[in-house]
Curated annotation (Swiss-Prot):
3-methyl-2-oxobutanoate binds at D45, S46, D84, K112. Coiled coil: none annotated. Homodecamer; pentamer of dimers. The gene is panB. Belongs to the PanB family. GO terms for cellular component: cytoplasm. Pathway: Cofactor biosynthesis; (R)-pantothenate biosynthesis; (R)-pantoate from 3-methyl-2-oxobutanoate: step 1/2. It is an enzyme of class 2 (transferase). Binds 1 Mg(2+) ion per subunit. It comes from Pectobacterium atrosepticum (strain SCRI 1043 / ATCC BAA-672) (Erwinia carotovora subsp. atroseptica). Its cofactor is Mg(2+). This is 3-methyl-2-oxobutanoate hydroxymethyltransferase. It catalyses: 3-methyl-2-oxobutanoate + (6R)-5,10-methylene-5,6,7,8-tetrahydrofolate + H2O = 2-dehydropantoate + (6S)-5,6,7,8-tetrahydrofolate.
Length: 264
């Protein structure tokens, strides 16, 4: 089997073949995910909440992401691994490249940054230096204090138009992938159709090219804080491997996310 690359994701978009992705933080789970057919994994700064017990992603450091990226890479050497750049690690060009290089050396295939068109010069700079970039728009958790909480984004016409403009700007700057979080289905459809790069949704309906879930949400182990867009696949199956396979299959077949997991 050959390694999964961004070329595969582009081909899947062209073929209208939906794909599932998931967050991973260690070797055991990344190996299990890959064995059950998930080829793309994100070492997310969500680990600040799910693994470290913080109330946000803000305390996560590059050192944390490097460590978990190394673990995930060992468990799934053929997966396409995305790694988050934590809060305040891409404030200047010099800092950005240094931090991104650390993640790439740790085993990431691509780095993910949160932000709109203001990030375009940063995306261009990284792309020119052979660092593939995934953008992240909509509800960007590192901006939770600006948003005033975890709220749906892009509901007004002006906000929706701005988000679409941001997505196009990131693509033009060289982003090869986009995560779209907690936006209305209609807006997610506009963005997915407007971009030539694959769009991965979370809380964006089933109209995007791919889906991503935090593994703890997909397995129902986040307690009372499970978001509306999540589904507990372990409750359906009673077995972790079966749950992961079910998640992947429901995404590929367009069953998940359903209307009950979507926003308008």
């Amino acid at each position: 089997m050959k390694p999964t690359t961004i070329s595969h994701l582009r081909q899947w978009k062209q073929e209208q073949r939906k794909f599932a992705t998931i967050t991973a933080y260690d070797a055991s789970f990344s190996r299990l995910f890959f064995e059950q057919g998930i080829r793309v994994m994100l070492v997310g700064d969500s680990l600040g909440m799910t693994v470290q017990g913080h109330d946000s992603t803000l305390p996560v450091t590059t050192h944390d992401i490097v460590y978990h990226t190394q673990c995930v890479r060992r468990g799934a050497p053929l997966a396409l691994v995305l790694s988050d750049m934590p809060f305040m690690t891409y404030a200047t060009p010099e800092q950005t490249f240094s931090q991104a290089a650390e993640l790439m050396r740790a085993g990431a295939n691509m780095v993910k940054l949160e932000g709109g068109s203001w990030l375009a010069p940063t995306v261009k700079m990284l792309t020119e230096r052979a660092v593939p970039v995934c953008g992240h728009l909509g509800l960007t958790p590192q901006s939770v204090n600006i948003f005033g909480g975890y709220k749906i984004q892009g509901r007004s016409e002006s906000d929706a138009n701005q988000l679409l403009a941001d997505a196009l700007a990131l693509e033009e700057a060289g982003a090869q992938l986009l995560v779209l979080e907690c936006v209305p289905v209609a807006l997610a459809k506009r963005v997915t159709e407007a971009l030539s790069i694959p769009v991965i949704g979370i809380g964006a309906g089933n109209v995007t090219d791919g889906q991503i879930l935090v593994m703890h949400d997909a397995l129902g182990i986040t307690g009372d804080s499970t978001p509306k867009f999540a589904k507990n696949f372990l409750a359906q199956s009673g077995d972790i491997r079966t749950a992961v396979r079910l998640y992947s299959q429901e995404v590929e077949q367009g069953i998940y996310p359903a209307e009950e997991h979507s926003f308008h």
